[in-house]
Amino acid sequence: MAALQQTPITFQSRSPPPTQIISGPTAKLSFSGGLKLPKLTIKLRSNRTSRRGGGAAGSKMVASAAGSYANALADIAKSNGTLEQTTADLEKIEKISDDEAVFNFFVSPIVGEEKKRELVDEIVSSSSIQPHVANFLNILVDMKRVELIKEIVKEFEKVYNTLTDTELAVVTSVVKLESQHLAQIAKGVQRLTGSKNVRIKTVIDESLVAGFTIRYGNSGSKLIDMSVKKQLEDIAAQLEIGDIQLAV
């Protein structure tokens, strides 16, 4: 992690190596989220890249490494006074990395670092990412740790929430909720937790049928379930009739 802590203002990544020549069958990289990507080509692979290590020990190592990167980035954001903007940047990056093609491109061992940096540059310019976050992404490319990005985002959220006395509430619903409804939910979570601030993250899940759920607390340990799915499950349990299947 020494490379991340060389300066309190910016990250510095290594100079890009010569372009790696890729031979064999190729496919154009596309992104379903609407991001305009550079014209890059990657070699097709028959196996899918895994996002996780195996076992409890592997999970602990991933969490530890992600926490170290997240804390280093948080130190930079604090010194720059950009905690809020950095959090927003990481949320953008997390959504982009959800695309399987983008993620597999970044973690592929047969794609050269120069090509990966081209993709970083495109993401940075199209999503208005701050320079220190862009440098952070390039460091992950240098260190071959891009697969940790989602864990890093989670760890950074924890650091941000601690620094700002913020409670994170994840609201899951069938359809997008209106802003006034989310504001009411935020006030309710604030009363329950006593936190100074509440951040709302929204998730769409059609399996809930109707209503919504709210997860908050340490690692989302507390749940308020106001969904029709939960009500139907409770009714089924009381009647001992098993799962209720709804006609679509």
UniProtKB/Swiss-Prot annotation:
GO molecular-function term, one example from the UniProt record: proton-transporting ATP synthase activity, rotational mechanism
GO terms, biological process: photosynthetic electron transport in photosystem I; photosynthetic electron transport in photosystem II; proton motive force-driven ATP synthesis
InterPro entries (UniProt xref): ATP_synth_OSCP/delta_N_sf (IPR026015), ATPase_OSCP/d_CS (IPR020781), ATPase_OSCP/dsu (IPR000711)
Assigned keywords, A-Z: ATP synthesis, CF(1), Chloroplast, Hydrogen ion transport, Ion transport, Membrane, Plastid, Thylakoid, Transit peptide, Transport
Coiled coil: none
Matching PROSITE patterns: ATPASE_DELTA
Cellular component aspect of the GO annotation: chloroplast thylakoid membrane; proton-transporting ATP synthase complex
UniProt-annotated location(s): Plastid, Chloroplast thylakoid membrane
Transit peptide, UniProt annotation: 1-60
Presence of keyword Transit peptide: yes
Self-association state and partner proteins as the record states: F-type ATPases have 2 components, CF(1) - the catalytic core - and CF(0) - the membrane proton channel. CF(1) has five subunits: alpha(3), beta(3), gamma(1), delta(1), epsilon(1). CF(0) has three main subunits: a, b and c.
Entry similarity comment: Belongs to the ATPase delta chain family.
Function field: This protein seems to be part of the stalk that links CF(0) to CF(1). It either transmits conformational changes from CF(0) into CF(1) or is implicated in proton conduction.
Protein name (Swiss-Prot/TrEMBL): ATP synthase delta chain, chloroplastic
Lineage per the UniProt record: Eukaryota, Viridiplantae, Streptophyta, Embryophyta, Tracheophyta
